[in-house]
Curated annotation (Swiss-Prot):
InterPro entries the UniProt entry points to: DENR/SUI1_TIF, SUI1, SUI1_arc, SUI1_arc_bac, SUI1_dom_sf
Pfam families, per database record: SUI1
Source taxon at top rank: Archaea
Alphabetical UniProt keywords: Protein biosynthesis, Translation regulation
Official protein name in the record: Protein translation factor SUI1 homolog
Organism of origin: Picrophilus torridus (strain ATCC 700027 / DSM 9790 / JCM 10055 / NBRC 100828 / KAW 2/3)
């Protein structure tokens, strides 16, 4: 049953074949905004492959903070959550780089 191809697309042309989260490098940085507020920025997650809204939702729950997805590709978390976000993203299988 595992070897069945239900899509009709040859295995070598299937876009999800060979995908590995370790190939993506996610960059985490901190930006200071108005009135001295700090925002954690997470960039480098491919929105075509990953559901960036679900990743943002799980990160917001983990750090107990508000946040948003800007331009469909950048996750902003309110506050300095670099270490917690790094640990969470690494547990999801991403390669993380702190900037």
């Amino acid at each position: 049953m595992k070897d069945k191809n239900f899509t009709g697309i040859p295995k070598e042309l299937q876009p999800w074949e060979g995908f590995d989260r370790n190939n993506e490098v996610v960059k985490i940085s901190v930006d200071k905004r108005r009135y001295g507020k700090v925002v954690t920025l997470i960039e480098g997650i491919d929105p075509k492959v990953e559901d960036i809204n679900e990743i943002a939702k799980s990160l917001k729950k983990k750090v107990a903070s508000g946040g948003t997805v800007k331009d469909g590709k950048i996750i902003e978390l309110q506050g300095d959550h670099r270490e917690t976000a790094r640990a969470q993203l690494e547990s999801m299988g991403f390669k993380v780089q702190m900037v």
